[in-house]
Amino acid sequence: MFINRWLFSTNHKDIGTLYLLFGAWAGMVGTALSLLIRAELGQPGTLIGDDQIYNVIVTAHAFIMIFFMVMPIMIGGFGNWLVPLMIGAPDMAFPRMNNMSFWLLPPSFLLLLASSTIEAGAGTGWTVYPPLAGNLAHAGASVDLAIFSLHLAGISSILGAINFITTIINMKPPAMSQYQTPLFVWSVMITAVLLLLSLPVLAAGITMLLTDRNLNTTFFDPAGGGDPILYQHLFWFFGHPEVYILILPGFGMISHIVTYYSGKKEPFGYMGMVWAMMSIGFLGFIVWAHHMFTVGLDVDTRAYFTSATMIIAIPTGVKVFSWLATLHGGNIKWSPAMLWALGFIFLFTIGGLTGIVLANSSLDIVLHDTYYVVAHFHYVLSMGAVFAIMGGFVHWFPLFTGYMLNDMWAKIHFFIMFVGVNLTFFPQHFLGLSGMPRRYSDYPDAYTMWNVVSSIGSFISLTAVILMVFIIWEAFASKREVLDVELTTTNIEWLYGCPPPYHTFEQPVFIKA
């Protein structure tokens, strides 16, 4: 029974739960690695000593947080749980493929961990650029294992994307138009399209790298007429849509949370929100070379990528101001989920502003590969994606489990985390502006002060993570059951109660026009 339920599951709720648990577990591993990084950088001089090991830790931290924490939780966990409930579908379109998507991830994770434990590990950075990732600078099987890991994670995501697109287009009730689906459903569908279009390009790039390393091809080797810059184009054609894949489901969740705790029945500017997400998805594919301003692109190429990148700020701004307009005049409830959403809006906006700075190719020449870039993408990931995940988690926790979190502790957890991440990443802007480069395990004494502050911040975040584990335990131990949910008419995922029965919407739902 246990094996049938959890290993061979075809139920979207169970698979969503598996994704959430797997993502939480991977998140702990990724957090541990990030604390190793900050411990090394907490003072001048060496702690680990070996730069190769340091870079293996940095690389693994990135891969784990992206492919095994944010994506499984946002798309696999929240997506699986909520999308069928929100559109009134009995399950996903392909329930067994759904199960396969999940079970490809643990082997993928295992391969990634294996890549660090054999030979010297893959100390390439998450971008895996040749020639550093070639078979000379990285002899041994480490990089090959990392490539296979990416292949499995990529197949998992592509299958999941097919499943979500089919489900959302095909499994709505007959009367429901695409423009009546909730914004979270839209965000997952757009994310799925991005995955479907970008991951095959990554697969091509890393497969060419694999043959370069093992079969003596020269796709990325000038000695045989290849070009390492080709790899960068292939990687970033995936890599840039990927960062929007990481944040778009978060946008959807934030829209729901802000609407709910403002006491509104709908978000401000629904169609504008949909348009903005579609625009972001489209533009995300035509800006990839802004990651390559320092590789010698033509001046008019740089001009195009600078301006195209800045255009993305427009739909993003539409979303931010629509969230603020949703808040406006609302009956605001200061719940923990609302705090996460407000923190998201504020900090994501700051991350967006530093993104506008980096979009300028002339400025980026100076800031590329400094801690300014690290600060920028951690503001949008560590405080955008993660805050959205936390907000979604505390908002939908009663739906998933039937129990309620302790309100006061959940708020305390938010404030500890808020202080921790800001203390960790705000000083990194200063380090970057004064020229501290990324991916080095040591630095000149001049950079000591802000690195100390940053490392202290990381340990404050650690206490927040530990407190979160306790808060979840406390909720299960106290068993405070959900009495009633407000606004269920406009939030149909709550209609079946908390937690909903194993099978929901077995008869089609009828929607009043």
Swiss-Prot record:
Subcellular location: Mitochondrion inner membrane
Binding, Fe(II)-heme a: 61, 378
Cofactor needs: heme; Cu cation
EC number: 7.1.1.9
Catalysed reactions listed for this entry: 4 Fe(II)-[cytochrome c] + O2 + 8 H(+)(in) = 4 Fe(III)-[cytochrome c] + 2 H2O + 4 H(+)(out)
Class of this enzyme: translocase
InterPro entries reported for this sequence: Cyt_c_oxase-like_su1_dom, Cyt_c_oxase-like_su1_sf, Cyt_C_Oxase_1, Cyt_c_Oxase_su1_BS, Cyt_c_oxase_su1_dom
UniProt keyword terms in alphabetical order: Calcium, Copper, Electron transport, Heme, Iron, Magnesium, Membrane, Metal-binding, Mitochondrion, Mitochondrion inner membrane, Respiratory chain, Sodium, Translocase, Transmembrane, Transmembrane helix, Transport
Top-level taxonomic group: Eukaryota
Record membrane topology: Multi-pass membrane protein
Mitochondrial intermembrane topological intervals: 41-50, 118-140, 213-227, 287-298, 358-370, 434-446
Main location: mitochondrion
Residue sites binding Cu cation per the record: 240, 290-291
Binding site for O2: 244
Pfam families the UniProt entry points to: COX1 (PF00115)
Topological domain ranges for the Mitochondrial matrix compartment: 1-11, 87-94, 171-182, 262-269, 328-335, 401-406, 479-513
Alphabetical GO biological process terms: electron transport coupled proton transport; mitochondrial electron transport, cytochrome c to oxygen
GO molecular function: cytochrome-c oxidase activity; heme binding; metal ion binding
Binding site for heme a3: 376
PROSITE patterns cross-referenced by the UniProt entry: COX1, COX1_CUB
Cofactor binding note: Binds 2 heme A groups non-covalently per subunit.
Function description: Component of the cytochrome c oxidase, the last enzyme in the mitochondrial electron transport chain which drives oxidative phosphorylation. The respiratory chain contains 3 multisubunit complexes succinate dehydrogenase (complex II, CII), ubiquinol-cytochrome c oxidoreductase (cytochrome b-c1 complex, complex III, CIII) and cytochrome c oxidase (complex IV, CIV), that cooperate to transfer electrons derived from NADH and succinate to molecular oxygen, creating an electrochemical gradient over the inner membrane that drives transmembrane transport and the ATP synthase.
Family: Belongs to the heme-copper respiratory oxidase family.
PANTHER family: CYTOCHROME C OXIDASE SUBUNIT 1 (PTHR10422:SF18)
Name used for this protein in its record: Cytochrome c oxidase subunit 1
Species this protein is from: Didelphis virginiana
